[in-house]
């Protein structure tokens, strides 16, 4: 079995994985004032925040190119790849996952699977890494898919944002939920639910209380087993440091990965968002 893993630019990948010849990534366009950008190609994360601040309109995102994925699958076939696993941004907040299912029929020479990751960022990157590791350990394609589904089912993320309007205008949250939060000065805690949608989990008064509540939620989640925890933020280093300190003060003694959201996710969460991702160690 020669396996390739395809993901998208919302997955947080360390440098060694980005350079791995068996991993391929599709760029997701970010549109600012009718100009199209691709993070890492013609848009740095600092440039993104500056352009977002300067623009009168919120940025938008589009889906990765279907034709690019179709062409990539043809290329992988010509290079002798026999199996492909695609792991992309949660189907609950992007239509891309649903739109690509037909491609398996277009490339019958490759055995492929596109499970819904139901997540993004660091947990998505963890899934990509695990799939590659399991393949190189000699696991069968079906065994990898079974293990991957176990990770997907045990993975989630909780988020606190500064401005709910980004989620509303991006179609990721209802206007009613945002209106309530803004009117009452509430800091809603959001989560990725079982369908990969971003939903309101709890409403908490004040940011400080919301941060402490995030730690309580996290400790409850990881009490029953071994998990990798990541703190993810959109230009909110002070909040990330504070959340990490609260977590360590609560007794958490394991390593905590700290990363920032890329431009695509920051488009929908806005500047100042803080989150933690939880995924099982398998």
UniProtKB/Swiss-Prot annotation:
Pfam name, any one: DegV
Record keyword tRNA-binding present: no
Molecular function per GO: lipid binding
Keywords: Lipid-binding
DegV domain mapped to chain residues: 3-280
Record InterPro entries: DegV, DegV_C, DegV_domain_contain
Top-level division of the source organism's lineage: Bacteria
Residues noted as binding hexadecanoate in the record, renumbered to the chain: 61, 94
Function: May bind long-chain fatty acids, such as palmitate, and may play a role in lipid transport or fatty acid metabolism.
Listed PANTHER family: DEGV DOMAIN-CONTAINING PROTEIN DR_1986-RELATED, FATTY ACID-BINDING PROTEIN TM_1468
NCBIfam families to which the protein is assigned, alphabetical: DegV
Protein name, as recorded: DegV domain-containing protein SpyM3_0586
Organism: Streptococcus pyogenes serotype M3 (strain ATCC BAA-595 / MGAS315)
Taxonomic lineage: Bacteria, Bacillati, Bacillota, Bacilli, Lactobacillales
């Amino acid at each position: 079995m020669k396996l390739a893993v395809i993901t998208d630019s919302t997955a947080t990948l360390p440098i060694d994985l980005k350079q791995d010849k068996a991993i391929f990534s599709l760029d997701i366009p970010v549109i600012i004032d009718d100009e199209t950008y691709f993070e890492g190609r013609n848009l740095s994360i600092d440039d993104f925040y500056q352009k977002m601040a300067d623009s009168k309109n919120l940025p938008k995102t589009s889906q990765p190119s279907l034709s690019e994925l179709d062409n990539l699958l043809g290329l992988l076939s010509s290079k002798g790849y026999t199996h492909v696993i695609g792991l992309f941004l949660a189907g609950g907040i992007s239509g891309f996952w649903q739109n690509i299912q037909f491609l398996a029929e277009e490339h019958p020479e490759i055995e492929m699977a596109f499970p819904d990751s139901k997540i993004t960022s660091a947990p998505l990157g963890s899934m990509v890494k695990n799939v590659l590791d399991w393949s190189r350990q000699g696991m069968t394609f079906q065994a990898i898919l079974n293990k991957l589904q176990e990770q997907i089912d045990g993975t989630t993320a909780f988020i606190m944002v500064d401005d709910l309007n980004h989620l509303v205008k991006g179609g990721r949250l209802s206007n009613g939920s945002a209106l309530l939060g803004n009117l009452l000065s509430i800091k809603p805690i959001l989560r990725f639910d079982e369908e990969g949608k971003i939903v309101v989990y709890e409403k908490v008064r004040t940011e400080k209380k919301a941060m402490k509540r995030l730690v309580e939620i996290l400790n409850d989640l990881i009490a029953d087993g071994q998990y990798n925890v990541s703190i993810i933020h959109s230009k909110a280093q002070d909040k990330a440091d504070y959340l990490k300190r609260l977590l360590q003060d609560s007794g958490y003694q394991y390593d905590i990965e700290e990363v920032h959201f890329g431009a695509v996710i920051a488009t929908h969460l806005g500047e100042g968002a803080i989150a933690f991702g939880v995924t099982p160690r398998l």
